[in-house]
Amino acid sequence: METCTIYDKLVRDNIPEIIQADHKTCRTHILNEKDYNFYLKEKLIEEAREVRSAESKDELIKELADVLEVVEALQNANGISLEEVLSVKHQKAKRNGKFEKRILLECVIEESDD
Protein backbone atom coordinates (compact mmCIF):
# COMPACT_ATOMS: atom_id res chain seq x y z
CA MET A 1 0.00 0.00 0.00
CA GLU A 2 1.30 3.45 -0.95
CA THR A 3 1.03 6.57 1.15
CA CYS A 4 1.67 10.08 -0.07
CA THR A 5 2.70 12.65 2.52
CA ILE A 6 1.77 16.14 1.32
CA TYR A 7 4.37 18.86 1.88
CA ASP A 8 3.43 21.60 -0.60
CA LYS A 9 6.56 23.60 0.22
CA LEU A 10 9.64 24.92 -1.49
CA VAL A 11 12.67 22.69 -0.97
CA ARG A 12 16.37 23.00 -1.66
CA ASP A 13 17.52 21.98 -5.14
CA ASN A 14 19.01 18.59 -4.17
CA ILE A 15 16.10 17.33 -2.06
CA PRO A 16 14.41 15.30 -4.85
CA GLU A 17 17.67 13.40 -5.49
CA ILE A 18 18.16 12.84 -1.76
CA ILE A 19 14.64 11.40 -1.53
CA GLN A 20 15.28 9.14 -4.54
CA ALA A 21 18.58 7.95 -3.04
CA ASP A 22 16.48 6.79 -0.06
CA HIS A 23 14.50 4.58 -2.51
CA LYS A 24 11.42 6.77 -2.38
CA THR A 25 9.55 8.64 -5.09
CA CYS A 26 8.43 12.24 -4.94
CA ARG A 27 6.26 14.45 -7.09
CA THR A 28 7.57 17.96 -7.83
CA HIS A 29 7.14 20.76 -10.31
CA ILE A 30 8.98 23.96 -11.19
CA LEU A 31 7.30 27.13 -9.92
CA ASN A 32 6.59 30.16 -12.06
CA GLU A 33 8.08 33.47 -10.91
CA LYS A 34 5.01 34.64 -8.97
CA ASP A 35 4.59 31.34 -7.13
CA TYR A 36 8.34 31.11 -6.50
CA ASN A 37 8.25 34.47 -4.71
CA PHE A 38 5.20 33.39 -2.71
CA TYR A 39 6.79 30.11 -1.61
CA LEU A 40 10.10 31.82 -0.81
CA LYS A 41 8.23 34.10 1.58
CA GLU A 42 6.45 31.09 3.08
CA LYS A 43 9.83 29.39 3.48
CA LEU A 44 11.20 32.49 5.22
CA ILE A 45 8.36 32.30 7.75
CA GLU A 46 9.03 28.58 8.25
CA GLU A 47 12.73 29.19 8.82
CA ALA A 48 12.04 32.11 11.18
CA ARG A 49 9.87 29.80 13.28
CA GLU A 50 12.71 27.29 13.37
CA VAL A 51 15.07 30.06 14.54
CA ARG A 52 12.62 30.83 17.33
CA SER A 53 12.52 27.14 18.33
CA ALA A 54 16.31 26.63 18.27
CA GLU A 55 17.51 25.67 21.73
CA SER A 56 21.27 25.43 21.26
CA LYS A 57 23.87 27.62 19.63
CA ASP A 58 24.51 24.93 16.98
CA GLU A 59 20.79 24.71 16.16
CA LEU A 60 20.59 28.50 15.98
CA ILE A 61 23.55 28.68 13.61
CA LYS A 62 21.97 26.09 11.29
CA GLU A 63 18.61 27.86 11.28
CA LEU A 64 20.17 31.28 10.72
CA ALA A 65 22.07 29.79 7.76
CA ASP A 66 18.73 28.61 6.35
CA VAL A 67 17.25 32.09 6.81
CA LEU A 68 20.20 33.63 4.97
CA GLU A 69 19.81 31.11 2.14
CA VAL A 70 16.16 32.08 1.71
CA VAL A 71 16.90 35.81 1.94
CA GLU A 72 19.57 35.42 -0.74
CA ALA A 73 17.13 33.54 -2.98
CA LEU A 74 14.52 36.29 -2.49
CA GLN A 75 17.09 38.92 -3.40
CA ASN A 76 18.12 37.03 -6.54
CA ALA A 77 14.53 36.34 -7.59
CA ASN A 78 13.71 40.04 -7.34
CA GLY A 79 16.93 41.51 -8.73
CA ILE A 80 17.94 43.01 -5.39
CA SER A 81 21.64 43.26 -4.58
CA LEU A 82 23.16 42.72 -1.17
CA GLU A 83 24.44 46.28 -1.37
CA GLU A 84 20.88 47.61 -1.74
CA VAL A 85 19.73 45.68 1.30
CA LEU A 86 22.74 46.71 3.39
CA SER A 87 22.30 50.35 2.39
CA VAL A 88 18.70 50.38 3.63
CA LYS A 89 19.75 48.43 6.73
CA HIS A 90 22.33 51.10 7.57
CA GLN A 91 19.85 53.93 6.91
CA LYS A 92 17.27 52.33 9.21
CA ALA A 93 19.89 51.70 11.90
CA LYS A 94 21.00 55.32 11.73
CA ARG A 95 17.41 56.62 11.92
CA ASN A 96 15.82 54.12 14.33
CA GLY A 97 18.81 52.47 15.99
CA LYS A 98 19.62 48.77 16.14
CA PHE A 99 18.55 46.09 18.62
CA GLU A 100 21.63 46.27 20.84
CA LYS A 101 20.03 47.86 23.91
CA ARG A 102 17.43 45.05 24.32
CA ILE A 103 14.53 47.52 24.62
CA LEU A 104 11.06 45.95 24.84
CA LEU A 105 8.29 48.47 24.10
CA GLU A 106 5.43 47.61 26.45
CA CYS A 107 2.98 50.33 25.47
CA VAL A 108 2.63 53.94 24.35
CA ILE A 109 0.54 56.20 26.58
CA GLU A 110 -1.33 59.08 24.99
CA GLU A 111 -3.38 61.74 26.69
CA SER A 112 -6.95 61.88 25.46
CA ASP A 113 -8.70 65.18 24.73
CA ASP A 114 -11.70 64.26 26.91
For each of these PLM feature ranges, what is it?
Residues 1-114:
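Flexible "arm" and connector segments at domain edges
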